[in-house]
Design a protein with these regions (language model features):
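Alpha-helix termini
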Residues: 82-93, 157-162, 197-205
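S-adenosylmethionine
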Residues: 161-234
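Conserved SAM-binding motif I beta-strand of class I
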Residues: 118-123
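S-adenosyl-L-methionine
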Residues: 1-91, 95, 125-163
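Conserved SAM-binding loop of SAM-dependent methyltransferases across substrates and taxa
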Residues: 103-116
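Class I SAM-dependent methyltransferase core
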Residues: 98
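Class I S-adenosyl-L-methionine
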Residues: 227-265
Length: 265
């Protein structure tokens, strides 16, 4: 439990080498919420408060407390995806792919808004893969989580050609986010355009909706370059506070527009 010597639970502390891969206790999750948001219930995951998901057996690492897509953001992302998915031809089948699955909460919320869709996640880091595998199993979530580098495995676990693909792209930002310039989408790890290249190589004939998590402040040039890659795009920033500012998504579609349902940038 917290005492007078307990450090401030913020981004720097949770990502520190000594703390980042430790399993955090419930009081620590609530302290991070209180210290960073003024709300001990801020780290809501899988549709539950911290107390609820902890009681269900869900456990997370210190870094996941900060890095996970929290429920309010996940819900808004899922709503936007469902809005675009509704414009696909009747009877369309959807596969949702998250190459940087982490907690799988972003994937969880997109699937929640796309009933019947299949979910596939990739996670490179063993500690996070092990933790998230146990969590989604305890929740009975319809997500297939694969351990390894998505770049090497994407083609081995591809959805059929008839599927509409939703690609949720939320790679580590690392130093791509700066207080001065905002988020540089060309400096994420890996750059967003490189990830798009991989998906276009594997899913060259599938309709794809790219859903890229973004910050409220974006370096203009990489954003503009990325948007030129898509046949249609839309930028949405949500009024939901985060540890470093508001987050949102850049939606970008390829081959989704056969019916002319998506127009403009």
């Amino acid at each position: 439990m917290a005492n007078a010597d307990t450090p401030h639970y913020d981004r720097d502390f949770l990502l520190s080498p000594a703390k980042r891969n430790q399993i955090v206790e419930l009081w620590e999750v609530e302290k991070f919420g209180r210290d960073s948001f003024g709300d001990p219930g801020a780290v809501s995951l899988y549709g539950m408060t911290p107390g609820q998901w902890h009681a269900r057996g869900v456990r997370i690492l210190a870094r996941t407390t900060l890095e996970a897509v929290r429920d309010p953001l996940g819900n808004r992302i899922g709503e936007d995806v469902a809005r675009i998915a509704a414009r696909a031809p009747p009877g369309s089948v959807f596969g949702v792919v998250d190459p940087f699955a982490g907690s799988c909460n972003g994937l969880f919320w997109i699937l929640r808004h796309l009933p019947g869709a299949e979910g596939l996640g990739f996670e490179f880091e063993q500690a996070i893969f092990d933790m998230s595998s146990r969590n989604i199993e305890s929740l009975g979530a319809s997500i297939k989580l694969v351990h390894g580098d998505y770049g090497k495995l994407l083609g081995q676990h591809r959805f059929p050609g008839a599927h509409h693909i939703v690609a949720f792209l939320a790679p580590p930002w690392a130093d791509a986010l700066s207080a001065k310039a905002g988020l540089d989408l060309g400096r994420t790890k890996p750059p967003i355009e490189n990830i798009v290249d991989e998906f276009e190589r594997i899913y060259s004939n599938n309709p794809i909706l790219y859903v890229t998590e973004v910050h409220e402040r974006l370096v203009p040039e990489p954003l503009a370059a990325l948007r030129t890659r898509f046949e249609w795009s839309e930028l949405n920033v949500y009024d939901i506070p985060g540890p470093t500012g508001r987050h949102g998504v850049l939606l970008g579609a390829m081959r989704w527009n056969a019916s002319g349902a998506l127009t403009g940038r």
